[in-house]
Every structure is written in structure tokens, then in C-alpha cells.
Amino acid sequence: MGLFDKIFGSYSDREVKRITPIVDKIDSLGPEMEKLSDEELKQKTFEFKDRYAKGESLDDMLPEAFAVCREASTRVLGMKHYREQLIGGIVLHQGRIAEMKTGEGKTLVATLPVYLNAIAGKGVHVITVNDYLATRDKEWMGQLYEFLGLTTGVIVHGLTNDQRREAYNADITYGTNNEFGFDYLRDNMVIYKEERVQRPLHYCIVDEVDSILIDEARTPLIISGAGSKSTDLYKIADFFVKKLREEEDYTIDEKAHAAMLTDKGVAEAEKAFGIENYADANNMELQHHITQALKANYVMKRDKDYMVKDDEIAIVDEFTGRLMEGRRYSDGLHQAIEAKEGVKVQRESKTLATITFQNYFRMYTKLAGMTGTALTEETEFREIYGLDVVVIPTHRPVQRQDHSDLVFKTAKGKYDAIVEEIIETHKTGQPVLVGTTSIEKSEYLSSLLKKKGVPHKVLNARYHEQEAEIVSHAGELGNITIATNMAGRGTDIKLGEGVLEVGGLKIIGTERHESRRIDNQLRGRSGRQGDKGHSRFYISLEDDLMRIFGSEKLQAVVDRLGLEETEAIESKMVTKSIENAQKKVEGNNFDIRKTLLGYDDVMNKQREVIYKQRSQVLEGENLEDSVQAMIEDVITNAVQAHLGNIDEDDFEKELGDLIKYLEDIMLPHGKFTVEELKTNSNEEITRKFIECAREIYKEKEEFVGSEQMREIERVIILRVVDTKWMDHIDDMDHLKQGIGLRAYKQQDPIQAYQMEGSAMFDEMINNIKIDTVRYLFHVKVEAEKPQRERVAKETGASHGGDSQEIKKKPVKKEPKVGRNDLCPCGSGKKYKSCCGREVV
């Protein structure tokens, strides 16, 4: 503790002192609440809602609302909030992190701010670390909320959309971070707004906040799917375009860096693939593959734009001539080049949507958290989430004795000493909880105890219900429990009869974790609510932490002392050396998380733009103005690309290319000629093209009707946006992986990622406009309402290695080609003897 803290108290001390008058006010309202009948107490909720609707703030209502909740808890649950718990509740309401020691009743504390914030009617989310705790807390605390006239719901794996929607529409919703995050992503993939399940993210309390916002922050949530692209279609499209003839079947626009089918080429495609209208929106996928195959074969040049290296396609940087490691062409072009060059076409599971917890939780209007251990990570909470940490005083003084670490030369010596200590302690009847850093080490220690005939239970974080049951008995006389550090977290260990007389629960740590916070959590399992207890860590110089980060000075001391295998040293210098090693690791991990957030923030801004655009489409906003703006942008950009800053000698050729390019997208063939337009200015040409396009679009709308046209616009925009966004996610991922491999002289990799990622995003937005306009002008207008379809089906939702497979198989839109059917490439051979040969 620094001199300032000694004189003025710590930050937490000062904050608690500032909050104390509010606690006094809540206390003073107690007698008044006790006089109310059950019905009168419940009516208070409706009174608060009415006052809130009339403009009174939640802060103003806090003392009275907390007093109501406290009295209801006493009646329904038989538990009255202590003053310290009221302090914790106020801190949580203020959108901060409350550090409360194990056994101080965090679950009960949360009821106070949850009740108060539920009055706003915008939904309160309570996040727990597993489904078991979410269900337990909902059923347990739900009694209190329902008594007060509020509804509760729980989100667990396996619910239907309707069940999820009902749970989210409740005043208070419990669930895990994974479930809430995945539902957010799925809501931004729906094709009808009625399919959404979540409401806007309002107020959230994260239990075990350090575990969720720090330990799990590095691994993103990913929803994956088979996508609509299969590698065989790239090969078939490649085979088809290789037979085409330049000028007759396709033309090359060098300025636009593109190749397009002529009318004859379109007819060839319709014949080869057995379709009536190549330009129909239902053939979007086929058009995409053929367009990219044309570009790969006739625009992209080997050893200029790319090289074939180790049977892979490597992009050549057009400015430096160097290979751009890790970078792939976007929009399926890379796969098209792979098909062209006969190397393996990379088949990847498509990322349909992804987000990190860091960015998901920062979307809440107000975020709060509670845990037994947060102070060591206070800097990270403040820098990344804007949350400060307030340490809440314990109801009773902590009586647990934390003994100095014992350091052994070898792991064998350490484990022998641990087994000996467990046996000696067991003779007294004192319960022992042994914390390990991995399942493997738990099982190793268990095998040593079995050899000695010592009865014990092993707990690994696999079965949450069973976990809670075993942990709840870990404090009974004579019980020995071995657990990985995180196992059973969230369940209190209550001491059995006669345990205090033998010294309370003894904690043995088998090695120091790389984070001091995890060590503190293990210690905190003992000494709850002022109980007696003991804790000690056993360490060897062969432990991972000591081996990788331990100081050479400590190793030298041990060597100088000439310790035997079973001998240990115990000193303040040793403990300080270990803490310094932990601080090194913590600092390193924080830097990694901050760097990843720097990358993800780029993607996050792009995600917000796309999701907002999708939402506007779904909400039924009039899209007519947006479509007209897209038409203007596509024409204006095309005119600028072809006719801006060119030599007079090239003007007529470029004008001809421009007309062909826009005829392919929206203008009627033969409507404009070079002869007619060559004397016009660029502005006049642009105006004529726009007027013509608008007239055609107006005629199309008059034919089909405005309502039908708006739905066609919705269907096509959703389909194009989703297709392009999924490809863009992949492209950004490849960019992130490759950017670290490239040498940027005096350039920050994150800055480079921001710049390139921004350029890629702008390109994607431009491609969305071009494709949307193309499909709208070529769509085959029918009397029946167009059907919205998902671009890709979800096949899995994963956070790190935790994959939740969805049983439904992805539905592919394209008709399946039988092995004995004619090959759709148009060769006249059977599929199995042609393009089907290489398809696995």
C-alpha cells in the first residue's frame, strides 16, 4: 500500500465511504417496508414503473427500490441483505465491478440492481459461466422477482427460437455469455424481422466477470456454415470458360480489371448449365462463379498478379513485387485461380458471423460485473471496458491464514510432500480442497493418493450439476476433494458440523497459476463469511511458470542451498520472485488481448455498418431511395473509372468499354453508341445514363407493382449483402493472419490492417451496389411474391474448441448432379468422367 493510500485510504475505501449515506437511507426505510402487506409490496413495482414513465430516474428511486427488494427477499427467500451487500448492489447499479469475496452472497447482491433496472422495462441480462448456474439462479431468485410482479427467463442450449424470444421478452433473463453472444449474431442473420429473439442490449450484470471478460476474451464466437460455394463448382466454371472465345463469347475490360460474357456467351452458359435465364437472381451463385472464372483465366496473369508456390496461389504485391504472405483474393477469385492453375481449391467452412466478447459486451448501454477477484486486472477492465473495480468490505473479518509458499527442487519432491500433508491433515478430520492447473495433474495426484489408500473425490470442470454437488460437500469432516482451479466455481463450500473445531477448510495449491487472480480464487474457497481456514501453495522449479518465467536468482539460491528432493524453502524473497513472474505473464497476456482488440475494433466498426444496413432492410424501410442512390453511384463511378483522366486518343475505346460494362449491369443493349455520345461531356453522359436507367426501373416497377418491387428489392439486397459480408469476414481473417508475416518498415501492423481492411470494406460496399443493381435490372418479374432465402445454413456455433453442432444438414440451393448425368459444364460427357472426377 502506498503512502497516499495509507493516509487517505484506497480508491475502494473512498468509494465505499461515498456510498454509505445511500445505504443509511435504505436502512431507514426498512421499518416502513415491514409494515406493508405482500400485495402492497408487490404494488410498489407498478408504482416505480409509473414514476419512471413520468420521468423520475432510477437513481432517485434507488433507496426505496432497494428497500422493497430487501424486504421481499426476507419474506420469500428468508435472506435479508447485509449493509455490505447493499453497497455491492449500488456499485453494480452504477455500472462498475464489485469485488466480493467468496461466500459474501453475490447472487443475492445482484437481485438489488436487477430489480431496480428491470423497472425501466428494457430487459436485464444476468450472465453466468454455465447453463447449470443460469438455471439454478433463475429458479432460486426468480421466486423473489415473481413475488414482486416481474417475469424471468433463462437461455440455455437447445431452446427453440420461440422459447428464446419468450425468455428475452421477460423483465430479467439469465444465461451464459456464449448463448447471449450467439443469439446476437443469429439475430443479424435473419431474413424476416419476426425471427429475431433479442431486444436491444440494455443492462447486463456479468457474474464471474474476470473469467468471462478476461480469460475468454481472446477467443471469438464464430457461427460457421457450409456456405453456398463448393469447390466442384469452381472447377466446373473453370472448365466452361476455358472453351470460350474472346470477343465472340466474352470481352475483357482492362480498365475495370474485369471480363464479361457477351450475349452469345450468356446463351452458351444457359445451354451448358440447362437454365432458362442466366441473369435471374436464382442463378446468382452460378453467375458469380463464371464471372470469377473469366477474371481468373483472362484478366489475372501468372507471375505478374500471382505465383504458384508449393502448390498454393501466392499474391504478388503490385507495388513491391513481393509475395503477400497470408493474403487471399476476395470474393472467390482466389479459388477461381486455384481451379485455373489445377492446384487444390481450398474448401473452408464459411464463417457466417463472428464477434469477440470484448465487442459484444461493450454494446450494452450499461455493463456491470461481480467476482471474488478483479483488482489485479483493474487496468484492463478500465482500459478496455471502461469499468472500475470497487472492493466491497466483507461482512465479517477474514480469518483464513494464508501461509507462505513452499518451494521444492523437483515436481516429484513437491507431490510427495503434498500427499504427506493430505494424509496428516486427514487424520485430524480437517477437510482438504486441492487445486490443480489441469485435468491431467488432477488425475496424477489422484493416482498417488489411491496408491496410499486415501479416500478422495476428483472434480474436473466437465459436468456442472455433479460439480456443484461435490463442491457443496467439500467442506464436510474428513472430505478430500481434488479439483481443477475453475471447477465448481459459483457454488459455495459451506463447512460441515465440527469442521471449525479442526481449523476449517484447508486449501492446497499444487502450483502457482500464471495469473495471481486464479490463485486468489482458489484461496478464496476457504474462510467464507469469517470462517477459519488455511491455504498454502506447493511449488517446484520444474513447474511451467517457474521454468519459463522464474528468475535465475531463485534457481541459484536453491542450487546453493543444495536442497534434497523432499526439502523445501520458504521465504518472502521466494514469494516475491513468484509474484514477479506472474506479473510478467499477466502483462504479456494483457498486451496480447489489447492487440487482438485493436484488430477486432476495425472489424467491429464494419460489422456495425453492415448490421445497421441489414436492420433497415428488415424493418421495412422504403428502399426506393437507396436503390436510386445505388444506380447513381454505380454509373458515376463507372464513368469516372473509364473516362476520368484519360488521353483523348483513348476516349472512344474507353467510351465503348463503358457502354458495354453498363449494358452488362443495367442499360439496354444498343440504346447508346459511341458515335452518339462522343461529343458529350462526362457529366452529360452520366446524366443520360442515369435518366435511362431510372426510366427502365420505373417501367419495371409499374409492371410488377410498388409493393412487389419493394419486396424484390429486400430479397436481393439481403442476399447480396449476406454473400459479400461472409466473403469479407474470410478476407479480413486472411489479412489478419498474413499481416504479421509481412515486413512493414516503421509501420504498426494494426495501422496497416486498418488501412487495408478499410480499402477492402470500401471495395465490398461498391461490389454490393454493383451486384444489387445488376440483379434488380435482370430479375425475372413474376406475379408470385419472391421468397427470401438464407445465403448459407448454420452448421456450427463455436467458442474456441467448444463446438455445438447443429443436427440439421445444410440445404444446398443448386440441384444435385448425379454421377451418370451429363456434366453441366457442357462437354457432353457424363459428370463422373468429366468435372466429377476430382470431386471427393
Swiss-Prot record:
GO biological process, one term: protein transport by the Sec complex
Catalytic activity, reaction form: ATP + H2O + cellular proteinSide 1 = ADP + phosphate + cellular proteinSide 2
Compartments in which it is found: Cell membrane; Cytoplasm
Listed EC numbers: 7.4.2.8
Region (Disordered): 787-821
UniProt main location, coarse: membrane
Residues annotated for Zn(2+) binding in this entry: C823, C825, C834, C835
Topology of this chain in the membrane: Peripheral membrane protein
Annotated binding of ATP, by residue: Q85, G103, E104, G105, K106, T107, D492
Cofactor annotation remark: May bind 1 zinc ion per subunit.
GO terms, molecular function: ATP binding; metal ion binding; protein-exporting ATPase activity
Keywords: ATP-binding, Cell membrane, Cytoplasm, Membrane, Metal-binding, Nucleotide-binding, Protein transport, Translocase, Translocation, Transport, Zinc
Family matches, as InterPro entries: Helicase_ATP-bd (IPR014001), Helicase_C-like (IPR001650), P-loop_NTPase (IPR027417), SEC_C_motif (IPR004027), SecA (IPR000185), SecA_CS (IPR020937), SecA_DEAD (IPR011115), SecA_motor_DEAD (IPR014018)
PANTHER family per UniProt: CHLOROPLAST PROTEIN-TRANSPORTING ATPASE, SECA INNER MEMBRANE COMPONENT OF SEC PROTEIN SECRETION SYSTEM
Family label: Belongs to the SecA family.
Subunit structure: Monomer and homodimer. Part of the essential Sec protein translocation apparatus which comprises SecA, SecYEG and auxiliary proteins SecDF. Other proteins may also be involved.
General function of this protein: Part of the Sec protein translocase complex. Interacts with the SecYEG preprotein conducting channel. Has a central role in coupling the hydrolysis of ATP to the transfer of proteins into and across the cell membrane, serving as an ATP-driven molecular motor driving the stepwise translocation of polypeptide chains across the membrane.
Identification of the protein by name: Protein translocase subunit SecA
